[in-house]
């Protein structure tokens, strides 16, 4: 078969020519549109009232915001086309901003101070704007240099009509993508130094080479001392949380829980930073709205509108749950972190909590967040350490924030587990391949178990040891559990209850050393357990109050107890003896004698305490004096009072008490150590805590006003759309 030859025969393309043709076609397609996932960090308008007049000023301000944890990265897509650079919403692909290539004044990769990788810088000058905008982006999959080359190639093609430079840039981009580098290795997280995490990390490094000082977990402190390894125990041997896992695992457990706390603080601060950015964007939009002459959307407003959008209800719920979780975790870690301690770190959360409550419309929304429940230790930590202003906020949030989970109805569904913005998850198993339990849920389970185990115990702690079927008549006649108050007690805060000697009180919760009781007037509060003794209680078939029942005909006298020695005679007031309780009838004489001796010792201690508490000339204590506050405007006397209130030694107080607040705030850690080698680091930590509290207070008022305006504006737009 002959093969056609000659000029009319089409030449057969070679493999090389086919490859070149496909390469040219691929280049045309690639040169048309490219798209990059990026994080938008911040936008500055040059010349506005924030001290940013040049690109260098913008870079320096970004570094300052980054060091303060005020940079909120917002993920989006950056698309480069032959005539525009467009920003898109990554989920909906909605166009946020579109900048003509002719409006791009500068495109560069810059390295702000304190960063390890470059950022993409875009300076855009719109015709209708007097000053250009400066945008900073962080590449997620590719470095800023490659994205810059693509945009600069598009600019060169736009201005000269020649596309070789962009084609080369896109080929370099494809080669980089084909290397399939790990995103985690390519893109480190945005540099943030949250104040609380930095303080905790400093404590860890100073305390034990980056590890917290691991002490027994809270439930081990309150439970009975565990038996030596190899011995048997009757205390719920099936529960792994009642016994320690050994000193090494105790340290690992403390480290794990401190790490969880760090990530909770990270997420809370990230959310607050987002609120601040949203408020700033709303303020800029409002400023532009007042100066706008036409209804056409100005350049840059799509990005600002997205930033000004407040968080969703689910996001508010998530951060409020994490704050509740942090309260319980701080109480659990009370023995593992110091300088600052858990009570001091507690104050860090109230600034964000106040801001979140205000921007969500008030305490009603936060009150609806029931999970996770607070532990009893968390409620005690809050009750004993909040300031009057914090207490006002705390009590406004309702029972789900002020009462422990033991007093609330159980929630349906799986236990709460925090999910962190960064995707981090705590280790699942320990080195022995045993599963770690969630620390807060573990504490709640322990408290429930402890209450169940203590319920049938004898009247040493006010409980009855009666089987329901053994005393049906008594069960029907006595409502609840009743105690007699032996001493006057004056409440010191809103959660405590003032009581008088010989008051009959109903016990609502006796799981801790402070019992929750109700007086005859129906008022509830906490009183110390060691001023109370068991009382039979009022009879339901009598129409009389507990207070009147005390003065009415007393019940028949119980069987007499063994007479104590004369030197330890009991007080004269009338009250039931230990062996007057029916629950002791089944005990042998040696056990009865043991309980009698316990009562004797307890009464002697109470009598000695009463000598210092009561007396005819004893003044009724007033409300607790407010703790001295430190600020840059404090004088030397206020600084001295603040140092004394924090418990520093007289040498440290004398050395630093001559400074003003501004001078003390200006000192660095090494300078404080030079003045006081033993306590300099702790002074620096306390000053850091105080500085953060002051910064939070300054931010709240401005943010509240801006968010309220933004909320009204959004509501107005919704109403207009409905109309």
From Swiss-Prot:
GO terms in the biological process aspect are: positive regulation of ruffle assembly; regulation of Rho protein signal transduction; Rho protein signal transduction
Q: Where in the cell is it found?
A: Cytoplasm
SUPFAM superfamilies for the chain: PH domain-like, SH3-domain
| Record keywords, A-Z | Coiled coil, Cytoplasm, Phosphoprotein, SH3 domain
**Location, primary (coarse class):** cytoplasm
Residue numbers spanned by region Disordered: 162-247, 442-477, 537-589, 609-636
Question: InterPro entries, from UniProt?
Answer: EPS8-like, EPS8_2nd, EPS8_PTB, Eps8_SH3, PH-like_dom_sf, PTB, PTB/PI_dom, SAM/pointed_sf
Domain PTB, residue spans: 35-164
Q: Where is the composition biased (Pro residues)?
A: 553-568
Residues annotated with Phosphothreonine modification: 187
Amino acid composition bias (Polar residues), ranges on this chain: 543-552
Question: Which GO MF term does the entry hold, naming one?
Answer: actin binding
Question: Coiled coil: which residue ranges?
Answer: 689-719
Positions of the SH3 domain: 478-537
Tell me which CDD domains the record gives: PTB_EPS8 (cd01210), SAM_EPS8-like (cd09540), SH3_Eps8 (cd11764)
What is stated as this protein's family in its record?
Belongs to the EPS8 family.
Kindly provide the name given to this protein in its UniProt entry: Epidermal growth factor receptor kinase substrate 8-like protein 1
